[in-house]
């Protein structure tokens, strides 16, 4: 079953598939197996890369970095940065243009390189998870939406938060990267939910909600609420983004309520019964690590000069759009 009609990755082999051993045998096999070697993981990675069309990989990883590099070498693009001295995004045509274009220009080569590398890191995990979840087309639509909407919304939020504090120009692709971080949270859970569905299809007697385990994609909202609670509650280290304990507490309550509702409706998320092969397990571990590092690096531990308000907008929009699809899928 797919979320949007495009093909999913072929099912990975699982312990006990078709051999009649039952779930207890699966658990013993899982416990007895040895960790994969680096060579085995490398072979699995290369096989996964070769299984995807080269044109599709190029479309995912090359056009946006090429655009950012091209903009950086064009003469006169320094004027594309957003001045925080303006009164609003709609003040003039020039302001509206710079509100959009500022997300595609950078202040230094290091700034550009940092955002390109972050983009590749995020998509290196988000793309294979999208294949597993059946979200290849949804990733394309989300990318187009992020490029069109996030720059304007992040510019508006930046002007509201910092417009009266400084007149320094704002620039950088980190708001859109933060949107991909939000997407990654949604697709991480969606991919695990797809794994759960395939496991249930193989063993109808071990339906979701039994001791076989499984993950519901809607648990992603708990992670987002919890991460926003930490972002607003923890000291950021910069004066222009002080802790807001009341806001953090509201998000913490929202996370707790969402967790309670989901626990009552679908049970807690459990990975034990899905039967992932080691290489697939590694993908989810890396994805979770990228999410954790991304939230800390863009929303919690904020370097001076980093536009955390743009990051927040990108993260929330980036999660909300695909999560709306999860809700629509039922």
PLM region descriptions:
Residues 1-71, 140, 188-235, 242-289, ...:
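Haloarchaeal acidic low-complexity proteome signature biased toward cell-envelope/secretome components but also
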Residues 59-78, 118-184, 221-229, 284-294:
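Small-polar-interrupted transmembrane alpha-helices in polytopic inner-membrane proteins
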Residues 77, 99-107, 128-140, 207-212, ...:
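Short juxtamembrane and helix-loop transition motifs at transmembrane-helix boundaries
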Residues 81-107, 289:
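Extracytosolic (periplasmic/ER-lumenal) interhelical loops and adjacent juxtamembrane/interface segments
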Residues 103-125:
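Di-metal (Zn2+ and/or Mg2+/Mn2+) metal-binding site signature of metallo-dependent hydrolases
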Residues 104-107, 163-179, 237-257, 275-284, ...:
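Interfacial loop-to-helix transition and helix-capping segments at the boundaries
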Residues 116-117, 121, 180-181, 313-320, ...:
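Generic hydrophobic alpha-helical membrane-span motif
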Residues 191-194, 296-303:
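Transmembrane helix exit motif
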């Amino acid at each position: 079953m797919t979320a949007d009609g495009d093909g999913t990755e072929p099912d990975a082999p699982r312990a006990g598939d078709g051999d009649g051993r039952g779930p207890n045998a699966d658990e013993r096999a899982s416990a007895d197996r040895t960790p994969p070697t680096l060579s085995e993981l490398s072979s699995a990675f290369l096989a996964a890369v070769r299984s995807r069309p080269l044109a599709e990989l190029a479309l995912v990883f090359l056009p946006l970095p090429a655009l950012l590099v091209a903009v950086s070498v064009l003469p006169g693009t320094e004027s594309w940065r957003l001045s925080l001295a303006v009164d609003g995004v709609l003040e003039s045509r020039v302001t509206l243009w710079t509100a959009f274009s500022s997300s595609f220009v950078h202040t230094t080569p290091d700034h550009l390189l940092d955002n390109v590398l972050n983009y590749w890191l995020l998509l290196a995990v988000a793309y294979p998870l999208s294949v597993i979840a059946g979200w290849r087309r949804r990733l394309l639509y989300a990318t187009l939406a992020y490029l069109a909407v996030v720059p304007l919304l992040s510019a508006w939020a930046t002007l509201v938060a910092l417009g009266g504090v400084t007149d320094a120009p704002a620039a950088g692709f980190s708001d859109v990267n933060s949107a991909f971080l939000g997407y990654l949270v949604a697709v991480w859970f969606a991919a695990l939910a797809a794994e759960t569905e395939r496991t249930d299809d193989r063993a109808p007697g071990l339906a979701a909600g039994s001791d076989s385990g499984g993950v519901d994609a809607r648990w992603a909202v708990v992670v987002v609420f919890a991460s926003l609670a930490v972002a607003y509650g923890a000291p950021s280290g910069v004066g222009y983004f002080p802790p807001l304990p009341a806001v953090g507490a509201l998000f913490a309550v929202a996370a707790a309520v969402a967790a309670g509702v989901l626990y009552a409706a679908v049970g807690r998320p459990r990975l034990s019964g899905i039967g992932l092969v080691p290489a697939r397990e590694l993908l989810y571990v890396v994805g979770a690590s990228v999410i954790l590092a991304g939230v800390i690096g863009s929303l919690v531990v904020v370097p001076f000069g980093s536009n955390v308000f743009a990051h927040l907008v990108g993260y929330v929009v980036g999660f909300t759009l695909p999560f709306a699809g999860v809700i629509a899928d039922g």
